[in-house]
C-alpha cells in the first residue's frame, strides 16, 4: 500500500507540543512576543474576523490546482473556462459564508461587496498569468489513497519538540523542465525583492519537509501577485480613452476600450509599450540543495526549537528596538507591564484567547467535487 511519510494524521495527532515556522519566527524576533502569543495564546480582540483579498485569491488558486490534479486523472478534463468558473464560485461561497457568519451595518456592506469584486478581478488576472497547463500537481498517498499535494499538512521530527508541522500550498512539477517546486502563493500590496528569498526560513523548512516525505524537489517557488486590481483607464470628455500611464495591463486597457465602444488597435502601438513594465506578478525561485537545507535546519530551526522548549520555564526577555516593537500586536501589554500599568485589564479588554486551527476532513476533501 502506497503511503507518503510525514503526513499529519488528523485522527491520531494534534498540534499540542509541536512547533511551527511562525512560532519559531515569533520566538526569534522577540521571546516575550512569543510568550504572549504561544504561552498565553493571546490574539487581538476584533469585532469580526478579517477576510482579505489575499485569502479569497488563495482559495481560488487552491481550487484551480485541484481542478488541474483532477484533469491529470480523468479522460474528460475540464476546460480552462470551467476551471475559472469553479474557482470564482468557490470565492463567492467563501465570501457569502463570511457575510452570513458576521454582522454588518447596512453602510458597511458596499465595502465588503467591493472587496469581493476586487478579489475576483485580481484572481482572474492571476489565473491567466499563472498558466495551469504548465504544471503537473504531485500526487501523495495517505493509507493508499491518492491525494493532490495541495494544502498539504505535514509533521516532521524536530528535536526539542513533538515535531514541526505546517501547510504547503502546492508541490508542482514543471512539465517543460521536469523541475519540481514547493510552491507558496502570496498576494500582497507590493512584490518582495528576489534577494529576500534566501532568508525565507519557511520555504527552507518546507524543503526539509519534502525531503522527509520522500518527495524530490528542485527548490521553492514563491509565486507572488499584487492584491490590487488593474486600474481602469479614464474615458475623456471627447470620448477618447486616456493615454496616461497607469497601473494596468494592456489586456485590461484593451478590454476597457471595447466596453467604451473604441477600437483597441487605435491605442495598441503606444499603450502596449507604455504599460509593458507594469509588474503585477513574479515567480521567485530559490534552488536549495539538500546540504543547504540541512544546515538551515540544524543551525537555525533546531536551536530555536530547543530554545522554545526552555522558554516555557523561564521569564522571557524583551527585544526592544523600534522596528520590532512598532509592528508588534502586543505592544500595549508590553508597555503596560514596563510602566507598571494594569496589564491584566488590557489583556481582558483588548485581547482574547486564540482558538487553534483545526483542519477537518472537509477541508482536505476535493472541493471540486462539491462545485
Locate predicted features.
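RecB-family 4Fe-4S metal-dependent nuclease core
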Residues: 1-371
